[in-house]
Amino acid sequence: ENFSATLSGLKINTPYYIRAYVYGNSRYTYSETFTSTIEITDINEQLKNYVAPEYEDNYASIASWSNRTQWNLANVHDPSVVLAEDGYYYMYQTDASYGNAHTGHGHFHARRSKDLVNWEYLGGTMPKLPDWVMPKLNEIRKAMGLETSAAAESDFGYWAPNVQKVKNGLYRMYYSIVVPGYLDGGTGATAWSERAFIGMMENSNPANNSDWVDKGYVVTNASDKGLNFNIPSTQYDNCYYKWNAIDPSYIITPENTHWLIYGSWHSGIVAMELNVETGMPKQDLGVPWAEGSAPAEYGQLIATRDINNRWQASEGPEIIYNAETGYYYLFVAYDALDIPYNTRVCRSKSITG
């Protein structure tokens, strides 16, 4: 008798050898073997046969604040995960949400899980813009000969936290805060964009989500162009900043040295050694600009796509150490945040490349 079967999940341009069998009267009977290949090489040909789903391919139905107990992994961007002493994994993230559901509910929202699959939403860890941000911003602006900024708190960006366990009873979160606007207060036609800051919070027990204590300023964007910031914000190949204080990653080496790895676009990824006890820069930071090269205390270059490119698509560094191989592995997001976005990895025996 004739019969039919459907095979799913097959790869294109891959030969498959197929054979059917039946079992009866205590024995197997096999068919002849035949081959089949799905030969589709052209994207247009694939699209001809594509059938779009009949459902909305998003989580809009549960994205609102009132549905936060259902979120699980909805409304998560740039996650950082740490295993705590209580056996839970704690996750922290960029302030980005469908329909801006997070707005008005704090920053750097947290979740926890026992299995890395099912996540309980815990809420924001930072209730408002830290008190140090505006004074530090205007201290730098004054030194640059600029007017005092009165940027609205609602316009700041809260991006890419990184959380690590330092030891039992001590966890550190490094986070990015992006200042809105342009250095001259204009529209970007005559000056480069404002800066970003990396700050740090500590907690003795991440289960107490409201107990994160802000420890203040860590580092900001650094320039090798002195005070020559009157560069249109569209001149990416001549951008004012050398290093961009976004996307921090924190690592403790086997030798117990502590490092902050950071960077986004601009000239690449840099490493800054930290004070073991405080988690702050090991060297005192001077003004975040110099002529010809960025101030050395703001970090050293450890990864770049092109040493001569001031605006390169790499960001989101994450660094780990593998004791079995003796290598540090640096993961970075590559290319623009759309179709070509991908992750690359490089390795080195040294934390500084």
What are these regions (language model features)?
Residues E39-G353:
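Carbohydrate-active catalytic/glycan-binding domains of CAZyme proteins
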